[in-house]
Each structure stands twice: as structure tokens, then as C-alpha cells.
């Protein structure tokens, strides 16, 4: 079946319309073949790609502190440390003068992705503090396939709950009651 293209005024057929059917085995096979072709074409540039990566990495300050974000009674921020793969997430009490000065004496480590990765791969999806500042919800992808597992951490004692949902898209947000968590699930063709 021929379809007129969306962005054009004339009635010319759109030869790529069939690619919109995400459930089609033909589309999935085509995408796999395109990805294999791309990898084959780029394989000759591996040394150049690595050289460029190292050059860019050399220009990055490896030990750094992000700009603190004030929210409620806290400042939330990230620290990067030389040699670590991922930034650590912290909070501290907001100074009485309203400044964004980090008080290291009241600093609390909220999440250390380096410890969670244990030398392997992780991708942190969502990082969401509950409105009452008592819980941290976060999502992790450990496979590289952009499928996320959901976790809730009690910030008072550090206890962790792994939520029994698989194949989540990594997004989440708290309801105002600080107990309800909304999240998205992936469809079968992800």
C-alpha cells in the first residue's frame, strides 16, 4: 500500500514507509544488516577513533564538582574523581546564607555508580529524589541494551529495594506522596 509522505505537498509515494512498522521481522532484519554494514565500514578507523577519544578525554578535568542544585533543605551535586568511570551523587545541607557552597561536613553520598558497576558496564537512567527527601529512586542498565531495573534506596539507613519490574525504559518520577513511583515499560520490539 502506497502512502503519501507527511512532510511533502505532492502525492509522491514514500518508498521508506515500510520502515515504520516496528513489529515487522523484515524491518528488524534490515536494521540488523544496516548495523553490521556500519560496523564493517567503520572497522578501518578503530585506531583513529581511539586516538580521538584519548585526545578528548585528556581535555576533561577528571576531578571535579558539578554546580550544586538547591532543592528543599539540601544542595544536590555530583563529584568526579580521577580514575573513576562514573560520577558519584551527593547532597549536603543548604547553607543558611543561601549560597551554593558545599558543606563537606554534612555531605552524604547518595549513590556511587562505580561501586554498583564493580568494574563492569552500567548506565544510570533516572535518578529521582522523593519530594520528602527520604528516598532515592534510580534505574540501572547493566546489559547495554537500554533495559533498566528499578531500585529505591532509603536515605536514612541505606537499605535498598529492587523493584520487581523488568524491561523498563529507565524513566521514573515520584508522586507527591513520596511513596508512589511512576515509570515506563518497554514494548516487545525494543
Predicted regions span which residues?
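Beta-propeller folds
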Residues: 1-190
Amino acid at each position: 500500500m502506497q502512502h503519501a509522505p507527511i512532510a511533502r505537498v505532492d502525492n509522491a509515494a514514500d518508498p521508506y514507509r515500510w520502515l515504520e512498522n516496528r513489529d515487522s521481522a523484515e524491518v528488524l532484519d534490515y536494521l540488523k544488516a544496516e548495523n553490521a554494514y556500519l560496523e564493517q565500514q567503520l572497522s578501518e578507523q578503530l585506531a583513529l577513533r581511539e586516538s580521538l577519544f584519548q585526545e578528548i578525554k585528556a581535555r576533561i578535568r577528571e576531578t571535579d564538582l558539578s554546580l550544586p542544585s538547591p532543592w528543599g533543605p539540601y544542595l544536590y551535586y555530583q563529584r568526579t574523581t580521577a580514575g573513576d568511570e562514573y560520577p558519584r551523587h551527593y547532597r549536603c545541607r543548604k547553607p543558611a546564607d543561601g549560597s551554593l557552597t558545599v558543606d563537606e561536613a554534612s555531605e552524604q553520598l547518595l549513590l556511587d555508580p562505580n561501586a554498583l558497576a564493580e568494574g563492569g558496564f552500567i548506565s544510570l537512567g533516572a535518578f529521582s529524589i522523593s519530594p520528602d527527601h527520604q528516598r532515592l529512586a534510580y534505574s540501572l542498565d547493566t546489559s547495554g541494551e537500554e533495559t533498566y531495573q528499578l531500585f529505591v534506596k532509603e536515605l536514612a539507613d541505606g537499605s535498598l529495594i529492587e523493584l520487581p519490574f523488568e524491561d523498563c525504559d529507565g524513566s521514573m518520577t515520584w508522586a507527591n506522596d513520596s511513596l508512589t513511583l511512576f515509570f515506563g515499560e518497554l514494548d516487545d520490539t525494543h
